[in-house]
From Swiss-Prot:
DNA-binding region(s), residue ranges: 39-62
Domain of life of the native organism: Bacteria
Keyword Cell wall biogenesis/degradation: no
GO cellular component: cytoplasm
GO molecular function, one term: DNA-binding transcription factor activity
Induction statement: By Spo0A during nutrient starvation through its direct negative control of AbrB, repressed by AbrB during regular growth when nutrients are plentiful. Represses its own transcription. Induced by expression of SDP (active peptide of sdpC).
GO BP term, example: regulation of DNA-templated transcription
Protein name: Transcriptional repressor SdpR
Length: 90
């Protein structure tokens, strides 16, 4: 879960997630929305993949990235349970 919070702590990675809400995209498609190098985009994508927040799959010669909302939902549920448990202690 720490990887998830690290992955979503960066504004560039949050923007990537926001883009992927619209559907699967290639790294090149994603890179068009940023003024940073393609290797930097790849680095951000790898961090998101390691946290399992996104997944990739090959279609022909292209690799498409997609959002994995299950991991995000699990992390949010944990956080909400943590907060709610703290409220009960007051």
């Amino acid at each position: 879960m720490n990887n998830v919070f690290k992955a979503i702590s960066d504004p560039t990675r949050r923007k990537i997630l926001d883009l992927l809400k619209g559907g699967d995209m290639t790294a090149g498609d994603i890179a068009e929305h940023f003024n940073i190098s393609k290797p930097s985009i790849s680095h951000h994508l790898n961090i998101l993949k390691q946290a399992e927040v996104i997944s990739d799959h090959r279609k022909g010669q292209f690799i498409y990235y997609s959002l994995n909302t299950t991991v995000l939902q699990d992390s949010i549920n944990w956080m909400l349970n943590f907060i709610n448990k703290g409220d009960n202690d007051l």
